[in-house]
């Protein structure tokens, strides 16, 4: 199973970006959560507008689904300029980037998603464009080839990535503003769900919003996706109003439990409990036990379980923590309690 098959996958599904546009905040005043990011960006944007300058180039990084694209749109709206969007894999040749840069107006925002996936050739073109607002273009071929410089209007590059560690130092150093987006707490997600419900014309109780929020894995994209599915359930099985009880029934039917775990998460945890006595166990053995490939376990299932403190990586392999046993109403084996007391968790 691939990640986008999962209801609680943080990556966008096909057509989901179009649906999310209806509920995305357009200005900082409507931006919920990330208080430090919101406060800083408000100051930076206000200062740039007072000086009548383009905002400094901005790098936004963090796990998928937390609102990097939303923040880029807000920056453009607050600055009163146009937003041009693309992504790292799309910009295959230097000419692709040059075409976008030469179409920018003064102050415009160029948003590059997955910027860590830019090819080295394209990245080289970006350096002088970011630093000096100049574009170096080669004209002709062979001995007759020559380089010419084109002046570009001042613009703001907003780069987004889920893998900040893969950015090269020269590229990372050219961003004047760097913002990390964190997972959202239940209170902020409840606010987001309630706001989205109002925009979609869905009748909802506050406790219904909270029920969806606490199962959304700290991710607004998942929260909005669950809201749409619970809305379907409310219209067919209820009177259209989302209550706490109805949301609980709908999400249980969708196999999303109170911690935001789905069947893949639970299958892995139960396999470790029943087949490997809680670990330690190697990832290859675990993959064979649940009939998934190693990459799916490492990249799709494991990260959230580790982040929530249900699993740990040790030098000897994966082990479950007390939280995993408590989740299923089980007692942790004494052997594991003793070993975790003296073994380093990586």
UniProtKB/Swiss-Prot annotation:
It comes from Cellvibrio japonicus (strain Ueda107). SMART domains: AAA. Gene3D superfamilies: 1.10.8.60, P-loop containing nucleotide triphosphate hydrolases, Winged helix-like DNA-binding domain superfamily/Winged helix DNA-binding domain. It is an enzyme of class 3 (hydrolase). Residues 4-184 are annotated as: Large ATPase domain (RuvB-L). HAMAP family: DNA_HJ_migration_RuvB. The RuvA-RuvB-RuvC complex processes Holliday junction (HJ) DNA during genetic recombination and DNA repair, while the RuvA-RuvB complex plays an important role in the rescue of blocked DNA replication forks via replication fork reversal (RFR). RuvA specifically binds to HJ cruciform DNA, conferring on it an open structure. The RuvB hexamer acts as an ATP-dependent pump, pulling dsDNA into and through the RuvAB complex. RuvB forms 2 homohexamers on either side of HJ DNA bound by 1 or 2 RuvA tetramers; 4 subunits per hexamer contact DNA at a time. It catalyses: ATP + H2O = ADP + phosphate + H(+). Belongs to the RuvB family. Residues 258-346 are annotated as: Head domain (RuvB-H). ATP binds at residues 24, 65, 68-70, 131-133, 174, 184, 221. This is Holliday junction branch migration complex subunit RuvB. One of its GO terms (biological process) is DNA repair. Mg(2+) binds at residue 69. Its EC number is 3.6.4.-. Pfam families: AAA_lid_4, RuvB_C, RuvB_N. GO terms for cellular component: cytoplasm; Holliday junction resolvase complex. Keywords: ATP-binding, Cytoplasm, DNA damage, DNA recombination, DNA repair, DNA-binding, Hydrolase, Nucleotide-binding. It comes from the Bacteria.
